[in-house]
């Protein structure tokens, strides 16, 4: 079965169940990068869909994904060359999107195109979202399940489907005497990782797992993506899709996998506070670690190992039935058009979006340069081999893990969990502190979120607060 279609159906089912959430992040910690395309109009013979050029406005896209910044800059330039419409792409630094968005939206030249990470993010920004009902880009979606709505209004649409798990180096795993078939659950993973760690000098590695960096370029992998697993299993057990009071039923399992990550690692756990996403990439690509938790978006970082040398495992945490678990698949990337922009800029932005998802240039860039699976009718199959691996799990009947982290109450909650994980790893905090940050912090932030929403309903809404 086609990877694009398979993963699209997987995400559609997840969204229909109300369990959709997000991905993100990058190893980049640089300041925001800006590029504006202002070249004169030129004809394009490669486009399968002719771009609309009636709009007199301009486009300003505040991009969430640093790892795709260069590809978006190039695509913006191509669009300007074809249409003459100026397109500016600004990419927020890793972990700074919400803060950057609030700052940019207060400017006279605010973004005409921005994004939210799912229902929680939408709750903050829905008053700024143009109703996309009847727009060309909305009509290009393969399923209505890829849209977020506020009542009947289509406030945002998903533009990429992504998958994450534990990426591994096949060559190194084989050299250690194992294959993917030897790892069917947490106990197997721990046995293999412990053995690799014990034999690291013999195998020529520094550890089984790359460093679990907890600086801002990497901590999202653990305070958000790894934390998704205990949330997913709790929601699944309780038959719910969100909650204002997480119980922490599977936090002992969260501890198991975190302990494994920081013990069978390339570095002392006390050093994790300063370890970065780039450190983990260097360790993995440098063949100093066998396992690396990340997702399909990281392909460009690890492709030098060779497509045939890359594998991906589910993130096992010791939950019952996890032998049938697949990878974590979903989206946290939803386009929103700023309804406070001028009519000309709104039309220019809608035209640009439609061109991105229908033209040969746009769909090729998103599939090949960005490595995306996109939920649009004209989508091209991605050449990203990690996506093919994700498709194999689905074809084998494995159950994909829903992205439940869009239901996390706030960025403040994530930061609290991240700080507690870091202190625990360093030996300056206890696991009870992690549980407190996870459970009590969830309830506290859920109350704050509700109070802010009530304030907005009462007419005191200003710029959203994080």
Language model region names:
Residues 131-145, 208-209, 213-216, 231-256, ...:
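Short, solvent-exposed loop/beta-turn-alpha elements that line the ligand-binding surface or hinge
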Residues 78-143, 155, 171-177, 184, ...:
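Extracytoplasmic "Venus flytrap"/periplasmic binding protein-like
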Residues 193-194, 240-274:
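Glycine-centered hinge/linker elements that transmit conformational signals in sensory
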Residues 174, 198, 361, 378-382, ...:
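Conserved C-terminal helix/tail region of periplasmic/extracytoplasmic solute-binding proteins
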Residues 155-159, 164, 190-243, 289:
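Extracytoplasmic/periplasmic solute-binding protein
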Residues 104, 111-112, 138-173, 207, ...:
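A structural signal for short loop-to-beta-strand junctions that line the ligand-binding cleft
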Residues 82, 176, 304-369:
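Extracytoplasmic/periplasmic substrate-recognition and gating elements
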């Amino acid at each position: 079965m086609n990877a694009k279609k398979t993963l699209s159906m997987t995400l559609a089912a997840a969204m229909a169940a109300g369990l959709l959430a997000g991905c993100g992040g990058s190893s980049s910690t640089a300041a925001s990068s800006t590029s504006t395309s202002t070249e004169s109009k030129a004809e394009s013979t490669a486009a399968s869909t002719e771009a609309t050029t009636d709009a007199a406005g301009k486009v300003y896209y505040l991009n969430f994904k640093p790892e795709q910044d260069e590809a978006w800059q190039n695509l913006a330039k191509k669009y300007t060359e074809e249409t003459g419409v100026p397109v500016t792409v600004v990419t927020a630094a890793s972990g700074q999107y919400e803060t950057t968005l609030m700052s940019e939206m207060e400017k006279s030249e605010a973004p005409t195109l921005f994004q939210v990470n799912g229902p929680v993010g939408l709750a903050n920004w829905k008053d700024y979202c143009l109703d996309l009902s009847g727009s060309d880009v909305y009509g290009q979606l393969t399923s209505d399940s890829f849209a977020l709505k506020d009542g009947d209004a289509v406030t945002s649409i998903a533009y990429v489907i992504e998958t994450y798990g534990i990426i591994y180096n096949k060559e190194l795993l084989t050299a250690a005497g194992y294959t993917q078939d030897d790892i069917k659950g947490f106990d197997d993973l721990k046995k293999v990782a412990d053995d690799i760690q014990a034999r690291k000098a013999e195998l020529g590695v520094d550890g089984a797992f790359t460093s679990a960096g907890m600086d801002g370029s990497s901590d999202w992998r653990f305070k958000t993506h790894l934390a998704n697993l205990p949330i997913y299993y709790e929601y699944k057990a309780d038959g719910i899709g969100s909650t204002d009071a997480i119980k922490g039923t599977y936090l002992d399992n969260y501890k198991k996998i975190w302990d494994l990550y920081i013990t069978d690692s390339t570095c002392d756990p006390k050093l994790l506070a300063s370890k970065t996403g780039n450190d983990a990439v260097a360790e993995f690509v440098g063949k100093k670690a066998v396992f690396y938790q990340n997702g399909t978006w990281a392909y460009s970082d690890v492709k030098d190992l060779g497509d045939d040398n890359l594998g991906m495992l589910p993130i096992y945490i010791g939950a019952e039935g996890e032998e049938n678990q697949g990878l974590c698949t979903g989206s946290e990337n939803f386009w929103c058009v700023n309804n406070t922009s001028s009519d000309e800029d709104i039309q220019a932005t809608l035209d640009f979006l439609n061109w991105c998802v229908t033209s040969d240039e746009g769909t090729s860039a998103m599939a090949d340069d960005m490595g995306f699976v996109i939920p649009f009718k004209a989508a091209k199959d991605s050449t990203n081999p990690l996506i093919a691996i994700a498709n194999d799990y689905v074809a084998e009947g494995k159950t994909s893990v829903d992205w439940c982290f869009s239901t996390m109450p706030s960025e403040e909650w994530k930061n609290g969990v991240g700080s507690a994980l870091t202190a625990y790893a360093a030996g300056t905090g206890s696991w009870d502190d992690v549980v407190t940050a996870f459970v009590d912090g969830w309830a506290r932030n859920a109350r704050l979120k509700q109070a802010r929403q009530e304030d907005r309903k009462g007419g005191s809404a200003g710029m959203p607060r994080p």
